[in-house]
């Protein structure tokens, strides 16, 4: 197991609970004689912290562990910035669901200490890279840990598009949009649109139409190495939006093509040893508990 000596902290802004947890975490790490580096945005709201600061991008270069304090949205943003550096990332939940940030604030010291002592699990989560092309030229690019979504933006009209997978025509469709999700993102927007839950170790991508104008349209699970192309109908009069993790956005024009494929670099996600994916699903999604009388 790796020994962590340079630990970066990223915190969600605008939350007093996050600031309180960041302060606790900072003190705990300093007491263990670790070199602590704060992301510059959270450092700005912690006057007198007395620590080295860094941009989020640079944290990946100077740290051998980054701890994210916030919710899943905070982890999504951190993942896109840090995946290329292969730095392990650990999450402390100060959001609502916490699929990715799985350490509770009340167990911060215990669980972080275990991780620092080498008692942890590592998961490699792949990201998607999206590119919009206009007449063959790239006009917008973005990465996503959860999903790439084609949607009508502020318009209430349906989108007409064609879907190709690995160069093969799949279908033409009218729908409110299309979600292309990783296994990580299968419990997010894709789930609410009727997609399946995929275990994060699966090397697969799910394609989920949003309110399609045909009853036979269903989600498709494809190989994780597939290359997807979505052609926006040239006859459309609206300009659809592409969103990566609901955080990065760019605009398509009629006739543009959206290309989505697996990104080469993966997120190294750290969990405590007692992490259980099915327990997370059961807790976060409200699944039924075990029947009495069974071992």
Curated annotation (Swiss-Prot):
Main location: cytoplasm
Enzyme class: transferase
Enzyme Commission number: 2.7.1.23
InterPro entries: ATP-NAD_kinase_N (IPR017438), ATP-NAD_kinase_PpnK-typ_C (IPR017437), NAD/diacylglycerol_kinase_sf (IPR016064), NADK (IPR002504)
Cofactor(s) listed: a divalent metal cation
Gene Ontology terms for molecular function: ATP binding; metal ion binding; NAD binding; NAD+ kinase activity
Origin species: Ectopseudomonas mendocina (strain ymp)
Residues forming the catalytic site: 72
Keyword Phosphoprotein: no
Protein name as it appears in the record: NAD kinase
Compartment(s): Cytoplasm
Top-rank lineage group of the source organism: Bacteria
Binding-site list for NAD(+): 72-73, 146-147, 157, 174, 176, 187-192, 247
Keywords: ATP-binding, Cytoplasm, Kinase, NAD, NADP, Nucleotide-binding, Transferase
Classification via Pfam families: NAD_kinase, NAD_kinase_C
SUPFAM superfamilies per the UniProt record, alphabetical: NAD kinase/diacylglycerol kinase-like (SSF111331)
Lineage summary: Bacteria, Pseudomonadati, Pseudomonadota, Gammaproteobacteria, Pseudomonadales
The family this protein is said to belong to: Belongs to the NAD kinase family.
Reaction it catalyzes: NAD(+) + ATP = ADP + NADP(+) + H(+)
Function: Involved in the regulation of the intracellular balance of NAD and NADP, and is a key enzyme in the biosynthesis of NADP. Catalyzes specifically the phosphorylation on 2'-hydroxyl of the adenosine moiety of NAD to yield NADP.
Nucleus listed as a keyword: no
GO biological processes: NAD metabolic process; NADP biosynthetic process
GO CC terms, sorted: cytoplasm
């Amino acid at each position: 197991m790796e020994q962590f000596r340079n630990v970066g902290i990223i915190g969600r802004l605008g939350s007093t609970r996050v600031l309180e947890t960041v302060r606790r975490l900072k003190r705990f790490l300093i007491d263990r004689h670790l070199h602590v580096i704060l992301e510059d945005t959270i450092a700005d709201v912690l006057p007198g912290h007395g620590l080295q600061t860094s941009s989020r991008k640079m944290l990946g270069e100077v740290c051998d562990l980054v701890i994210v304090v916030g919710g899943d949205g905070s982890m999504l943003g951190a993942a896109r910035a840090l995946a290329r550096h292969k730095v392990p990332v650990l999450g402390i939940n100060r959001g609502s669901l916490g699929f990715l940030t799985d350490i509770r604030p009340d167990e911060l010291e215990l669980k972080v200490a275990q991780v620092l002592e080498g008692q942890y699990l590592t998961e490699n989560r792949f990201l998607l890279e999206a590119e919009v092309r206009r007449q063959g030229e790239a006009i917008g690019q973005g990465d996503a840990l959860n999903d790439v979504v084609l949607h009508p933006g502020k318009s209430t009209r349906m989108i007409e598009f064609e879907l190709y997978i690995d160069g093969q025509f799949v279908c033409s469709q009218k729908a409110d949009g299309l979600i292309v999700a990783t296994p990580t993102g299968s419990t997010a927007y894709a789930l609410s649109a009727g997609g399946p839950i995929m275990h994060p170790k699966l090397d697969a991508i799910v394609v989920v139409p949003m309110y399609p104008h045909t009853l036979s349209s269903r989600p498709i699970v494809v190989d994780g190495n597939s290359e997807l192309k979505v052609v926006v109908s040239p006859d459309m009069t609206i300009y659809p939006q592409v969103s990566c993790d609901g955080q990065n956005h760019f605009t398509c024009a009629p006739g543009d093509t959206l290309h989505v494929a697996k990104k080469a670099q993966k997120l190294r996600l750290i969990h405590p040893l007692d992490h259980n994916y099915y327990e997370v699903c059961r807790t976060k999604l409200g699944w039924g508990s075990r029947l009495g009388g069974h071992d």
